């Protein structure tokens, strides 16, 4: 009799757990669509000059996790093509932080792709609102109720297309990790969070950042990091130097150094700069003659 009673209890307990699980899944599915509309409104209320469209939102009640899928970001001045597409953005509780009595979040951007061209850049230059004040940090923080402690990007992609017959500037397989973000507000030029970034430049060169950041700095984050560029094709710099009548052909660039970029300081210290097999020409153009004379005059004055 006792064995039958115990068996019945297990049957009821198992049934209750199954029903609870099914109920949670059904509730989650019913909430997804309303949550998607709410999340879009919340994000767009914080952004200036940009609009977010969400393909879907999925809440996972058991892990208290949130997935945003097919996230598309457009610049309102130039809505086509979009400036960013994120197949999946996941936010969840950082469970290991609970061991230290901290209730914080992990954020993961899976294979995000960013596309910029000269129209996007010129629209930013004309705008009265600086890019750093567009509300990006506020929008990111609005996604999840917990404060972000770890932020990761896996296999990101960045493309910039300039005018003229230049190859697009392309960074691929970008992996980024920032930890200990929700530290206390730091004094100026103190960077409490660890960060690391690596990626490919033009499929052959590499870029690495290894340093620290202050993600609570305002109006934008502060970074102090060592950097390494290895075997980067000079094609990467053609659109930039062409504005100064300089033509680059072939060759690679490698460099190491330190950079500091924060609200009150922007400094780069080069420790090594190596340029190999580069062909460089200066081309005089009639339409830039006045600007050339102005630059030459400044050089003479400084000399």
Language-model-detected regions and their locations in the chain:
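Structured catalytic/translocation cores of nucleotide/phosphate-coupled proteins
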Residues: 39-43, 53, 140-142, 194, ...
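Elongated, acidic membrane-bridging lipid-handling scaffolds
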Residues: 12, 129-236, 241
């Amino acid at each position: 009799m006792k064995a039958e009673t115990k068996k019945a209890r297990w049957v009821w307990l198992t049934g209750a757990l199954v029903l609870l699980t099914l109920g949670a899944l059904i509730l989650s599915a019913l909430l997804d669509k309303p949550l998607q509309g709410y999340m879009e409104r919340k994000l767009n209320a914080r952004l200036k000059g940009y609009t977010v469209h969400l393909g879907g939102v999925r809440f996972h009640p058991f892990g208290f996790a949130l997935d945003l899928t097919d996230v598309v970001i457009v610049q309102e001045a130039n809505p086509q093509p979009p400036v960013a597409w994120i197949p999946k953005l996941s936010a969840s509780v950082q469970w290991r932080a609970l061991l230290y009595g901290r209730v914080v979040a992990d954020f993961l951007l899976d294979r995000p792709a960013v596309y910029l061209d000269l129209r996007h850049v010129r629209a930013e230059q004309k705008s009265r609102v600086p890019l750093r004040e567009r509300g990006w940090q506020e929008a990111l923080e609005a996604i999840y109720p917990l404060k972000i402690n770890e932020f990761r990007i896996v296999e990101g992609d960045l493309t910039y297309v300039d005018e003229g017959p230049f190859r697009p500037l392309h960074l691929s397989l970008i992996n980024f990790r920032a930890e200990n973000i929700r530290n206390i507000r730091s004094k100026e030029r103190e960077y409490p969070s660890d960060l690391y970034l690596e990626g490919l430049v033009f499929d052959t060169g590499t870029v690495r950042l290894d340093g620290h950041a202050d993600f609570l700095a305002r109006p934008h984050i502060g970074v102090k990091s060592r950097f390494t560029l290895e075997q980067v094709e000079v094609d990467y710099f053609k659109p930039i130097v062409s504005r100064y009548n300089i033509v680059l052909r072939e060759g690679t660039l490698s460099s190491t150094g330190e950079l500091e970029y924060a609200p009150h300081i922007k400094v780069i210290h080069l420790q090594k700069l190596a340029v190999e097999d580069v062909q460089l020409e200066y081309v005089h153009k009639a339409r830039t003659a006045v600007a050339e004379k102005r630059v030459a005059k400044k050089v003479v004055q400084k000399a």
